[in-house]
Amino acid sequence: MTLNRIMKWLLFAAVIAGLLVCAFFVFRFNQPKPTTNIHYADTQNKQQTLDMYMPKGKDEDKKKHPVMIYLHGGGWTGGDKNRVASKADYFTGQGYVFVSMNYRLHPDANYGQMADDTANAIKWVKDHADEYQIDSSKINVMGHSAGGHLTALVATDSTYLKRVGLSPKTINSIVILDGPLNINQFIQAIPSYKKVFGKQEENWTKASPVTYMNQKNVPPVYLVTGWENPEVYRFAEKLNHEKGSNFVFRVHSLSHSDLNKWFGSDRAPKEAQEMTKAVMAFVKKQNQ
C-alpha cells in the first residue's frame, strides 16, 4: 500500500471517529436531564432517594402528565436508580414523567422494609404531583427482577400502602419485567436467596405476590416473562379479570437482563421492540 493510500485511510478513519464522537454527544445532549437524589423518606439515607425525569416541553404545556415509577433489579442486594438504560428517554418521549427510585438493600433491610420504601416513594410522588405536573390519578409502577417482585407485592398486599395512608387503588397499573411472583417456588429453584427471605416457608409465602392475587382493588398488570410459568398467567388473569395470556409477553430470544436493557430502545432487537410496544399499549390504555 502506498503512502498516499495510507494517508487516505487514516483520514477516513479520523472522520468516522469524529462522527461517532459527535453522535455520542448529541445522544447524551438529547437525554432528559433528571432532578436527582430527591429524598422521599424522612431520612438522609441515599438508598431512599429518587430521580425525576420530566417530559420535554412540560413547562410550556402546563398540563399534567401520567407518571411511571421504576424499581431496578439486583437480587434485593444491588442495583441503582441511575441504571435506567433507554427507559427515561422512552417514557418522557411518550409524555410521561419518569421516576427511578432506590430502595434499601439486603443486608441493611429485609424485603418488607424494601416494600415500605416503595410505598413511601409512591406517596411522595402523589403528594408532590402538582409540583411536577403529575396527574395523581395516573400513577403507574414498573419493576425489573427484584424490583418487579416489590412492585407486585406492594400492589397486591395492601399492608404497605395502608401504612402511608394509601390503598392499591392509588396505583393505576403495574408492569412486571421478569420478576418472581412466588417466592416459595423461587427459593426452591435458587436456595441462596434464603439469605434475603429467611429459612421459614411461612415468610416466603408472606413475601409472595401470588398470595394476595385474589384481593380486591388490585391494579391491572402486564407481565414480561422469560419462561413458561402457569402461575404468571393466573396472576395476570386474577388482576385483570380477563384471559391471562392477553397480559403476558413471553420472550424467547432475550435474556433476563437483556429484556430490561433493551426496553424502550429504538436500537433494540426485534423481539425487544415488540415487547416495548406491547407494554406501552397496555400502559396507554390504562391511562386514557
Predicted features along the sequence, with ranges:
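Short amphipathic alpha-helix adjacent to the substrate-entry channel of hydrolases
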Residues: 82-99
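C-terminal catalytic histidine-bearing segment of alpha/beta-hydrolase fold enzymes
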Residues: 224-227, 244-288
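Structural cue for short, hydrophobic secondary-structure segments
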Residues: 70-73, 100, 124
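The feature captures the conserved acid-bearing segment of alpha/beta-hydrolase catalytic domains
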Residues: 166-168, 173-187, 201-234
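Alpha/beta-hydrolase active-site loop
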Residues: 109-130
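Primarily recognizes the serine-hydrolase "nucleophile elbow" in alpha/beta-hydrolase
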Residues: 123-188, 204
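Short beta-strand element of the alpha/beta-hydrolase
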Residues: 62-74
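N-terminal cap/lid segment of alpha/beta-hydrolase-fold proteins
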Residues: 24-62
